[in-house]
Amino acid sequence: MAQKFAPSLMGMDFMNVQEQIEGLNPYAYYYHIDIIDWHYAKNMCVSPQFIGQLRQITDLPLDVHIMVKDMGLDMIEAVIDAGADIVSLPEEELGQNVFKYISYIRERGRKVGIVLGPTATLEDTKYYLDQVDLLTFMGVTPGFAKQKLIEPVLDKIREAHRIREEKGYTFETQIDGGCNR
């Protein structure tokens, strides 16, 4: 499978968003956008309103990674209404709501993404992995750019590819963070 370039907008210069997006559009497959609430990770990033503004300057798909504590359907609805094409949810925040969230995202015609933190396991996803479109592996501790890759994450990615092959699943995989070598 060919590699695809999905730049994260976390480290962009927010004073020059349009110029940067227009420069990346010819090369990007889609954009990765983080919504962080200071509780999930000690950082803050963009809001759903930014997604709506971004939608005005690019037609590329938007993968919105919701990194918030106490996530609910209202947050998922807000990012979909703003223009998200893929809604990526942190596995450790799903709990008993996982099937409700997946169903809602599908009903709204969007793709389902699941994000595995560095310590999460693929075992955690076994009951719903067949319903996932994009499986994201955090290569760093969530919340901050420019960290060093946590090497064992690469083993999890290989394991996911093996499971996908064995079971005939169709999810794509991506790594988020630490891809600087």
List each language-model region with its residue ranges.
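Conserved N-terminal beta1-alpha1 strand-loop-helix module at the mouth
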Residues: 1-88, 94-97, 111-112, 125-132, ...
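A short, flexible beta-alpha/helix-coil linker loop
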Residues: 37-38, 140-144
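Short acidic, glycine/proline-enriched helix-loop-strand junctions
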Residues: 101, 107-110
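Short gly/ser/thr-rich secondary-structure transition/capping motifs
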Residues: 115-119
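Acidic, divalent-metal-coordinating active-site segment for phosphoryl/phosphodiester hydrolysis
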Residues: 178-181
